[in-house]
Regions:
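Glycine-rich flavin
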Residues: 21-162, 331-332
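The feature captures the short pre-catalytic strand/loop hairpin that immediately precedes
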Residues: 190-195
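Alpha-helical interface subdomain recognition
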Residues: 1-76, 199-332
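Flexible, small-/acidic-enriched active-site or ligand-binding loops
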Residues: 130-135, 156-186
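Short, glycine- and charge-enriched coil/turn segments that flank and shape catalytic ligand pockets
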Residues: 96-101, 125, 185-189, 266-270
Length: 332
């Protein structure tokens, strides 16, 4: 197994890292969703085209590229719709007529698609609701997975679409979306491609978590070296050293599972991503909680990135059922 990045992959990592470093530091991390202008700028850099399948006009980047980009997003604690809008919805429309209408706009960052599981077709119209649709308030259209498992595309401007805003724990906005007899365009997605899309979205989430873990650990180590108690840096106390070492262990175990999932063969990727999700979400939450503890009361304030990072990790670790759902899937 080759764990080294290719020259092209290293260029992508460095590009994303520089872009985020210009916009985020410890005072701005996770202070709110990425602005539409910054999202479009990433599209102009070709990042979304890289992660979009060739059937939808993209460059067909694979799991390794998803891991690289998502980990950098997580390291900056950037709040973006990458997993759902690009990896799930971008693949849902690939190969269909919807790709002609939405593909370029999605890759350029000019339009946002949101994934909305819920609802049912009744007399050829979509009825029902989808709860907690991430970025649902800003979505131009919805990729809906009905209760029967069919994929449909719904125009967000349809008069039968009703949205109620919901603020999530990390400060980002979601929506409760109701579909009242709306027109829905069927999406024909090969079963293998949809399973791959779900795996890549899951991979993106755990990669974000690993990036966030690395950032929170770095911030914590810097803090305990600077914070003095009894005339010494608290980093000199053995109990603090042991706690930081435990955080590092959680990070490295998580990174190993992430690499295994990203480098798995396509037929084994779904299970490898599920195994990563079964561990990484819980490990990330423990690391974030430990980071808050080592910062003391300041760790839960908005002045420091640590508390905001905890809230971001809390959300990511619970998406799509989190570790509980992943462990249940492995046991099935």
């Amino acid at each position: 197994m080759n764990l080294a990045l290719s020259d092209e992959q290293a260029m992508v990592r460095d590009m994303v890292r520089r872009f985020l470093a210009d916009r985020y530091d410890a005072t701005t991390m996770a202070k709110g969703p990425m602005s539409p202008d910054d999202w479009r700028a990433l599209g102009e850099l070709g990042l979304f085209a890289l992660l979009t399948p060739e059937q939808a006009g993209g460059l067909g980047g694979g799991a390794a590229e998803v891991m690289i980009v998502s980990e950098e997003m997580g390291r900056a604690l950037a709040i973006t719709p990458l997993a759902e809008a690009i990896l799930l919805c971008g693949r849902a429309i690939a190969g269909s007529a919807a790709a002609e209408e939405w593909g370029d706009r999605l890759m350029q960052g000019d339009a946002l698609l949101a994934f909305a599981p819920g609802g049912a077709l009744v007399d050829g119209r979509l009825r029902g609701s989808a709860a907690i649709v991430r970025d649902g308030m800003d979505a131009a259209a919805f990729v809906v997975e009905t209760e029967a498992g069919a994929l449909m595309l719904v125009d967000g401007q349809d008069s039968g679409v009703r949205r109620t805003p919901v603020r999530l724990v990390d400060g980002s906005m979601a929506a409760h979306v109701r579909f009242d007899a709306v027109q829905a365009q069927p999406l024909t997605v090969p079963a293998g491609m949809w399973a791959e899309a779900q795996a890549l979205a899951g991979l993106s989430i755990v990669a974000e978590l690993v990036g966030a873990m690395a950032s929170l650990l770095d911030l914590t180590v810097d803090y305990v070296r600077q914070r003095h108690q009894f005339g010494k840096p608290i980093a000199s106390f053995q109990v603090v050293q042991h706690r930081c070492a435990r955080m590092y262990t959680w990070l490295e175990q998580s990174r190993s599972l992430l690499l295994k999932a990203a480098l798995a063969e396509e037929e084994a990727r779904v299970r490898a991503v599920t195994a990563a999700r079964a561990y990484i979400g819980d490990a990330a939450l423990k690391l974030a909680e430990e980071a808050v503890q080592l910062h003391g009361g300041m760790g839960v304030t908005d002045e420091l990135a640590i508390g905001r990072g905890l809230r971001r990790v809390l959300l990511l670790s619970r998406l799509h059922g989190g570790g509980i759902a992943a462990r249940a899937a492995l046991a099935a």
